[in-house]
Regions:
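Enzymes that bind and transform nitrogen-containing heteroaromatic metabolites
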Residues: 1-19, 75, 143-145, 150-358
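Proteins enriched for Cys/Gly/acidic motifs involved in redox and nucleic-acid/cofactor modification
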Residues: 14-18, 43, 107, 121-149
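Short alpha-helix boundary/capping motifs
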Residues: 54, 111-112, 137-139, 306-307, ...
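Short capping loops/turns at secondary-structure boundaries
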Residues: 99, 103, 119-122, 137-141, ...
Length: 358
């Protein structure tokens, strides 16, 4: 049953920030009585959602939850209290919640009410699902996931800037699915200037799950006529800059964009400072989509935690544009390293998923 709860939690990724994505399945005598997951915007929590949809009494049942039930009064009542009031006899949690507001208190509340508590089943997968939430708690920043679509020899465009299309329709659709599982998409000013992108999720049924669009632009030069700005009231747009002309800032804010100032470094946005600011705003999972300058900045700052590489079956040569800008490595000992998680075939292309090496 924990696997079912974990699957429910995965369905909520990208939709619950700043809260974690939690799944809950409640069973008795081998029969599922209720299912729930954290809903969009982080409320209701997974346990409360399951209890609200229960067909009948939950007395004597077992609740499988992917994270310790909360015990503090926030915008809603504590989930630990809701489970006690529902009459469950046993709670199986994948993880103890390290949030200082919880941190074992939820389990203690359950035990005090005579409910049996077990912790640890499904812990590895639950940790991965909420890696962004845990990253923000422990380091004050979101998890950053770099997505690259490249040729077999690691290039993303010809010398003249032609890039449509390196990968096929299936891989591009999967990239939109990936967007829907993140709180935000991040690109640099060069990508916006070259492509004038929408940065939305354009898969049928997932359009409303388009994440926050973030643009790093040190001089705040984002055009009010760009597609991003024109759609800022439909899909949130955040401009992260070190400085900006006051008249342009006024136009951007009037269009619905949010302007965020951070410190600079060598004439560019300091990505470490930007990461902390995004964490303060509640983001837990950010998909970094480019371009090469942004990718290298995040890699040099050791901020990339996950990496997805879609590879198309073509060679482009050394005169083409690289997926990653210069890293200035003094030797291989200084190279960012990742551990392979999985390789899959997506249409006629491949997808490699990597995790930052520990």
């Amino acid at each position: 049953m924990m696997r079912a709860a974990l699957a429910l939690a995965r369905r909520s990724l990208g939709r619950t920030w700043p809260n974690p994505a939690v799944g809950c399945v409640i069973v008795r005598d081998g029969h599922v009585l209720a299912r729930g997951r954290t809903q969009d915007g982080g409320r209701p929590h997974g346990e409360a959602d399951a209890i609200a949809h229960a067909a009948g009494s939950l007395k004597g049942a077992t609740a499988y939850v992917t994270l310790e039930p909360c015990s503090h009064q926030g915008r809603s009542s504590p989930c630990a209290d809701a489970l006690v009031e529902a009459g469950v006899a046993r709670v199986v949690s994948a993880l103890q919640d390290p949030d200082p507001k919880v941190d074992g208190r939820g389990h203690a509340r359950l035990k005090a009410a005579g409910i049996a508590v077990e912790v640890g089943e499904g812990a590895v997968e639950a940790t991965e699902i909420n890696a962004g939430f845990l990253m923000r708690l422990r380091h004050g920043r979101p998890l950053f996931h770099l997505k690259i679509a490249a040729s077999l020899d690691g290039h993303t465009a010809t010398a003249g800037g032609h890039s449509k299309w390196i990968t096929g329709p299936a891989a591009r659709a999967d990239g939109h699915r990936l967007r829907a599982t993140h709180d935000a998409i991040l690109v640099g000013a060069n990508t916006v200037a070259a492509d004038d992108p929408d940065l939305t999720c354009r898969l049928p049924g997932l359009e409303r799950y388009s994440p926050v669009r973030i643009v790093l632009d040190s001089k705040g030069g984002l055009s009010p006529d760009s597609r991003l700005v024109r759609s800022a009231r439909e899909v949130p747009l955040w401009l992260v800059c070190t400085e900006i002309d006051s008249s342009r800032e006024y136009l951007l804010r009037e269009a619905g964009a949010d302007v965020i100032r951070v410190v600079g470094r060598q004439g560019r946005v300091d990505v470490t400072a930007a990461a902390q600011e995004l964490g303060k705003r509640g983001l837990t999972r950010v998909l970094v989509e480019g371009g090469a300058t942004v990718a290298s900045a995040f890699l040099k700052a050791e901020l990339i935690d996950r990496l997805s590489v879609y590879r198309g079956g073509l060679m482009m040569g050394a005169d083409s544009r690289s997926a990653v800008g210069p890293l200035g490595l003094a030797g291989l000992d200084f190279a960012p390293r990742f551990s392979l998680v999985s390789t899959s075939i997506v249409g006629g292309d491949t997808l490699e998923t990597w995790r930052k090496a520990s």
